């Protein structure tokens, strides 16, 4: 298992919401936990993954996601079991929609 940490610049999401969880930890899938944190200018991301050596891929996927969604001020905790970048984007989008109550 590899543990990665990122701080990503994004537009702030200004909602007072309870934490949410989306997805499941299973083969080819991942779980996303979304909560707020006190730094309004960055999104904190922690990734625990079974796929070792893909930090650059995670960085690219997360940067692209943060450009499409306002996520600064949030903490994203991802528990991954080999999800593809497309599945990561899907789960992140679902988790943010759930957090926003959409």
Swiss-Prot record:
Sites bearing O-(phosphoribosyl dephospho-coenzyme A)serine, chain numbering: 27
Localisation per UniProt entry: Cytoplasm
Record's keyword annotation contains Membrane: no
Keyword match Phosphoprotein: yes
Gene behind the chain: mdcC
The name this protein goes by in its record: Malonate decarboxylase acyl carrier protein
Naturally occurring in which organism (per UniProt): Acinetobacter calcoaceticus
UniProt entry keywords in alphabetical sequence: Cytoplasm, Phosphoprotein
One of the record's GO molecular function terms: acyl carrier activity
Any one GO cellular component localisation term in the record: cytoplasm
Entry's family note: Belongs to the MdcC family.
Top-level taxon of origin: Bacteria
Pfam families xrefs: ACP (PF06857)
């Amino acid at each position: 298992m590899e543990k990665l940490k990122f701080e990503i610049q994004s537009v702030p999401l200004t909602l007072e919401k309870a934490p949410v969880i989306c997805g499941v930890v299973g083969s080819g899938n991942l779980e996303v936990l979304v909560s707020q944190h006190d730094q309004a200018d960055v999104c904190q991301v922690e990734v625990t993954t079974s796929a070792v050596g893909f930090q650059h891929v995670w960085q690219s996927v997360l940067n692209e996601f943060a450009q499409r969604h306002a996520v600064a001020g949030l903490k994203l905790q991802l528990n991954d079991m080999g999800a593809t970048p497309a599945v990561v984007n899907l789960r992140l989008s679902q988790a943010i929609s759930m957090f926003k109550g959409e």
